[in-house]
């Protein structure tokens, strides 16, 4: 999967600041343990970095 990243939501966005929930929604992560496959771009990497304590990333 060159150029793609698998991201899984491991911690809930409930009770977090609104900013974090908006970033998660932008990544397509709406439910706990949901996994999405995203293209590997600097913008996506930046969003993942903001919520890195809540997600698990597989290259």
From Swiss-Prot:
Has the keyword Ribonucleoprotein been applied to this entry?
yes
- The protein depicted here goes by the name Large ribosomal subunit protein uL30
Q: Which GO terms describe its molecular function?
A: structural constituent of ribosome
**InterPro entries for the chain:** Ribo_uL30_ferredoxin-like_sf (IPR036919), Ribosomal_uL30_bac-type (IPR005996), Ribosomal_uL30_ferredoxin-like (IPR016082)
Subunit description:
Part of the 50S ribosomal subunit.
Would the keyword Ribonucleoprotein turn up in this protein's UniProt record?
Answer: yes
Tell me the PANTHER family matching this sequence: LARGE RIBOSOMAL SUBUNIT PROTEIN UL30M, MITOCHONDRIAL RIBOSOMAL PROTEIN L30
UniProt keywords (A-Z) are: Ribonucleoprotein, Ribosomal protein
| NCBIfam families with a match to the protein in the record | rpmD_bact
Which Gene Ontology BP terms does the record give?
Answer: translation
The family annotation for this protein states: Belongs to the universal ribosomal protein uL30 family.
Gene Ontology, cellular component aspect: cytosolic large ribosomal subunit
């Amino acid at each position: 999967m060159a150029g793609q990243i698998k991201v899984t939501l491991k911690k809930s966005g409930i009770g977090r600041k609104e900013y974090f929930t908006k970033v998660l929604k932008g990544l397509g992560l709406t439910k706990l343990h949901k996994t999405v496959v995203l293209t590997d771009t600097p913008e996506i990497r930046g969003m993942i970095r903001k919520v890195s304590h809540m997600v698990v990333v597989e290259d």
